[in-house]
Amino acid sequence: MVVERTASFGKLHLKGIVASVGLTAGLLVLIFPLPELESPARIQLALTLGALSFWASGVMPAPITGMLYMGLLLITNSSDPLTVFSGWTNEGGSLWLVLCAFLIASGVERSGLARRAALSICASGQVKGFQSLIAAIAVIELLFALIIPSAFARTFVILAVAKEVCKENSVSETDAAVINFACFALAVPTTLIFLTSEPALNTLVVEYSELGLSWVGWFSTIGIPNIIYLFLVTVLFIRVFKPSGKVFVDGVKSRASLEDLGRLSPKEKKMALWLSLMIAFWLLYPFMGIGIAWGTMLLTSLMFLPRIGVLDAKAFADVPVGTL
């Protein structure tokens, strides 16, 4: 009991030290003259140092620290609301896209489509353990990059399938967390492989690349190096993140479970149809004059309609509001 109290006090003491260091650094930025920085920039830097120290120490929950940071930026007039909330208000609508990605992944999981996809992957016989599972995630990321330009959307769909693979094969929480992390880590190298990817459609990227809009030119110059990059990241990930125990993917059990599922259920068919509509929009939105976030938001909203939809109010429980 004494040892536990001592350890708890030690952690609390360390949190206080880290937070104090950050706050002190912020105060020094405000007190000492920095001619290169104007007053708003100095306030922003001081608040950022304080917020980082709070995040690092865990003195407050991360979402509350974020709220405090944004509130102080606005109260001190060191920034304006459009800049502070640009993730919600800018043309790209990145945070709306993240919100929709969570809801789409929830639909894939709740409809049973994720479990069927997971069983199909396990039953193929190609995925037998931790290393082959990580390699499979890399391959799926590569294939999905061709048809789903948004890294957020494809990562969360793949994540839903990866969770089901871990659940079906009784993977430990520690190893499951590593496998889930792989879905995000291996998504990074795939963002610029194909000209259909979201960053590649950015006019500035195309302009500075001096490749025009040639699909083949883009792939040969940027795509192939990024495929090599994906391969190297996959190998590095497998080398760095070792499983805590043996991860065994039971192909025989998965095949039996897949047979028990039978044909696609009505809900799975609906979700497959909605995914097809999403993919069609993601491929065509540059020619439609509609922002990817706003079109995705519209389609995701329609997924809540009765009869034809697959989502309900409970789906919002899968959205980590604190993270947003």
PLM regions: where:
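Hydrophobic transmembrane alpha-helices of multi-pass small-molecule transporters
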Residues: 1-97, 220-324
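Hydrophobic transmembrane alpha-helices that form the pore/transport pathway of multi-pass ion
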Residues: 122-192, 201-211
